[in-house]
Amino acid sequence: MAENTIKWDKDADGIVTLTLDDPTGSANVMNEHYKESMHNAVERLVAEKDSITGVVITSAKKTFFAGGDLKSMINLGPENAGEAFDTVEAVKRDLRALETLGKPVVAAINGAALGGGLEIALACHHRIAADVKGLVVGLPEVTLGLLPGGGGVTRTVRMFGIQNAFMNILSQGTRFKPDKAKEIGLVDELVGSVEELVPAAKAWIKANPDAHE
């Protein structure tokens, strides 16, 4: 049985905070625990959306989300191709369901959000990052001979256009610090501390109740 890696908290205003917190590791990664937990969380959001006003996604770890589970990926071979494809498609379906929930969804980025971590944030309608030491965002998959598989290609192209997305984000594998990430549009807002993140995210939801796809 997979460990639950996402804590659910709903406040009096109907805002649900999903806190990524994998009990099996020091960082959140896109392992089987995450995949099942995110699927269950999204199903619950859809089922209860009439009583929900918005969603905040944040992390209890020092990093927001470290990306793919490299330990599992390194063991993949041709015989696992079908299974790997199905897994990636399931991840994309859940993020798309989150994106099209019909409620504003905000990523409250408290630490590094790389690869799959940034892809989770890109599925949100607003991204707030703490301007703190060590926080970087990016899609570094190309440095491993890979491309983002969780919707990052589609969403960056939609946000920035094909040439800009490819040349400046996808093909370089650059890790952007908070100020640069905001400058280029990967994040929308900066706050001065991690403690300010969730309150800022909730304030944005209240001010933008119709900010959803």
Which sequence ranges carry the predicted segments?
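Glycine- (often His-adjacent) and acidic-residue-rich active-site loop
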Residues: E48-S51, S59-R93, A113, T143-G145
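Conserved CoA-thioester-binding segment of acyl-CoA-metabolizing enzymes
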Residues: M1-T58, G82, R93-R96
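Amphipathic alpha-helical segments at domain termini/boundaries
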Residues: M1-D21, S26, L122, N164-E213
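Glycine-rich beta-to-alpha active-site loop
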Residues: A97-L144
